[in-house]
Amino acid sequence: MCSTPGGKWHIVSGRTQEHVAPYMAVGLSTVVHGIGSRQDIERNLRIVEDGIHAAVSIIGINMPVRLIALAEGALTGFTDEIFDIPHVTAARDLFIDIPGPETDRLAALARQYDTYIVAQCKARWPEVIDKRFFNTLFVISRQGEIVHKAAKNHLWCRERSCVPHDVYDRWVELFGDGIDAFYPVLRTDDIGNIGTICCSDGEYPEAVRALAFNGAEVVYRPSEAVPMTQMGMEPGGTWLLQNRAHAHFNNVYMVCPNVGPVYVHPRMEHPYDIAGGNSHIVDYQGNVLGHTASGANTFVAGIIDIEALRQFRTMNLNSNWMKDLRTEIFRRMYSEPVHPKNLWLNADPLQHADVDEIYRENIGRLVARGSFTPPAQAFPGARYIAPSESPEDADWAQVRALWPEPAEE
């Protein structure tokens, strides 16, 4: 089956499920080179290809590899976020279409190794809205077909991707307003039901719960800047803590590859490890199956047993928590908005400093409602500090000069 936002699933009562054989899932952590044009993605693709060849050769001797997961940024990096490039400019000059030549390369690998590939990439979605890009999650089948496509729904404060909520009315017009419109799940007969979120999405318990309600059994959550979100003494910091909790509360597997060190631009002598490694795979009870401390061109692997998960969910009278939910008592909790919708439906997305003010207004709403209690004394809060040569739209050429001129096509 193919899943896209708003896709409907038809369940046949009493149907006997086919047995899903255990399989190996692999998460890649690859070194990333920032891109100055779409052509620069080629370099990252070569690194990903080498990583897939190596990982399958090494881990495939244990059990068939049926799911390979790439980290966030593995293809397109983070140029737009780091340099605060205007959204429309980044959509035009940097990002891809799905399907396209880049996904065709991954499709060839999926066919070669008889595996699904799940990945993230910033991509245009013109059938939704023009001159925008979305942080997009997609799955390629063993036959090399794109069978799932979803958008990231929550951003950290320095990401300027468009999300469905930013163009809410248009999104609902196309896909409806059900859970499946925002958290579609890919249902397969050979690797289980796959849900996808990305990085900041996982800071909200509702995201994985929505996928679980929609049938997800394996959830892909790539990348987190672990040092930024509190590392602490435990490997993986709060990122691993969150993913173990997601797995435990929802009885899902979590497949979580972290991005490797990043060369922001070609003139950097050394890459910067912005994410801190600690890729992991967690089982449906919250146990860590695989953990890799390093993030520098390596991988994490773990065995996924869908049949065991299904038995656990349906035989259990205790720790399959979703069965106990009293949904009516939570219904009004979200009746009042926090973040405004449709911000970029009729206006171009703003840059970092201006968006900071939107977040401050959100904080103000929570204070006004009594959700947040203000401190006794107010101090200046976090703010955007521009680099010495902050690029406005007219200065994109100056930033672009950090990269060699792309070859003529």
Language-model regions: role of each:
Residues I98-V118, N193, C199-V300, L402-E408:
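CN hydrolase (nitrilase-like) catalytic-core segments centered on the catalytic cysteine
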Residues A119-C121, N135-V139, P184-L186, S279-I281, ...:
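Short beta-strand scaffold segments in enzyme catalytic cores
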Residues A108, W125-A245:
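Active-site catalytic loop in hydrolytic enzyme cores
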Residues C2-I11, Y253, N258-E409:
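C-terminal beta-strand edge segments of enzyme domains
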Residues T89-D104, D169-F175, L240:
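A short acidic, glycine-rich active-site loop
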Residues V48-N62, L106:
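A short, N-terminal amphipathic alpha-helix
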Residues G14-G27, P184-G195:
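Beta-strand-turn-beta hairpins that frame and shape the catalytic cleft
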Residues A74-R92, V128-F133:
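Metal-dependent catalytic neighborhoods of phosphoester/phosphodiester hydrolases
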